[in-house]
Amino acid sequence: MYARPPEPVWKLFSMYAMSGKNETFHGTTILLVQKDGRVVLAGDGQVTFGDTVIKQRARKIRRVYNDKVLVGFAGATADAFSLVARLESKLEQFQGNLNRAAVELAQEWRTDRALRHLEAYLLATDGKNVYMISGTGDVIEPDDGLLAVGSGGVYALAAARALVRNSKLPARKIAEEALKIAGEICIFTNNEIIVDEL
């Protein structure tokens, strides 16, 4: 008897579709740390489809608007890419004013019928301002310079707060350590960490 070869990825997706499950690509952790004049955005690399790990080293952090703005995203992948593109368009429209671009995107997201159903969160920074933009039309600016989204977001946020309060670590090291802790707890988060900073 011969072993059956592994199913190609496209067949795996079609099997999920035929099973009647409404599976989406999801699961990630994105963390933003603002400390001592630096802003760091970190994210893990895992992409899951239902309960299957599809990719280990996905890049969920992007530089947009001539590399002047960092954006991290969590949620449905296609939705997140669409929202990042719309945010970049708003940044172009408002000459790089992240505050105005974030508010306009959130308003559009909340009121536009097509956008309203997108399932994603964005973290964005221009090095001074930091925002979380949600699908409910919220633009949130943190009190403590820390933001996190995704399935492991609460773990990463708790770890980052503890490290900020009880250590002298720089922002980059805090982000890396907090993501590692989230990866130890959240099954949808791995330790293939991508970090970028402004």
Annotate the PLM regions.
Residues 49-50, 131-133, 140-142, 156-158, ...:
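Short, well-ordered, mixed-charge alpha-helical segments that flank or form enzyme active sites
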Residues 117-151:
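Long, charge-patterned amphipathic alpha-helical coiled-coil/hairpin "stalk" segments used as oligomerization
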Residues 28-34, 39-41, 120-125, 131-132, ...:
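Short beta-strand scaffold segments in enzyme catalytic cores
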